[in-house]
């Protein structure tokens, strides 16, 4: 059978289960071209040395009803929650461990390990999807709820993916921005595959103080007028900081005053940078012809910067580490942060 290559363009939101309950009522306001409920069983494969993961690829067999598909997702471009990556699909007759021959049929690898592919983890979830007509585009909205399983470890799945099936990317941004939810939402760049690989492995807090110093050092070495590189670098770092912060429970910080100081301080450094380098956003807005979006973006930056300074004051006065991180988490999952990230993704899309 011949493999099929597709180019995905999608936005992904991590959400609370309650938002998943409210979503159908909201979508009923639009023209629904298709609606379906599915159960998707996925097994991910890799070599013992995680060769594919190191190439930022994911190989899975998906069972949808009685249909089996082998899919290779390759390393694409992820900006905050906006995903754009090629994937290669091969219909299967039986569910058997993929072979090197099948893998080479999907993608022109220069070399593959001689070892045998093996199952690493599975993702099993219910998917409710709607094909929505919006402006000049067709957008697939998929609500996934289930779990990732890696050996004895499990992690819940609760997310919405918005995939552009036809039309233009701006319609995708505009549609997602219409969502009425006020809290418990944030853009996620972590695929289910990435989460599966991390599940069960020991994770460590990043030293963001040193990471920030390295960032500023690299920035000084770059061209002073290369606003695109500066913008993409700081946005990439922000997304990593946001997702790492939300991946840990606030209880991790409960007994450690300095860890809490450093975590909130990392966001202070970030927003101080945005405050001091407004010309970067101005240049990007001009290049992307998004000048009308700039005032709201700058206003949201200032609003979040004020809230972070208030958090620092709260922590200094109360010494309550866990409550401080809970407040930070609520801010990162808030409506103002959600809208701000959409505007940043609009500026970043399709830039080198």
From Swiss-Prot:
Catalytic activity: triphosphate + H2O = phosphate + diphosphate
Entries under PROSITE patterns matching the protein: CYTH
Superkingdom to which the source organism belongs: Bacteria
InterPro entries linked: CYTH-like_dom_sf (IPR033469), CYTH_domain (IPR023577), YgiF (IPR039013)
EC primary class: hydrolase
GO molecular function ontology, one term from the record: inorganic triphosphate phosphatase activity
Domain CYTH span(s) in chain numbering: 6-203
Protein's recorded name: Inorganic triphosphatase
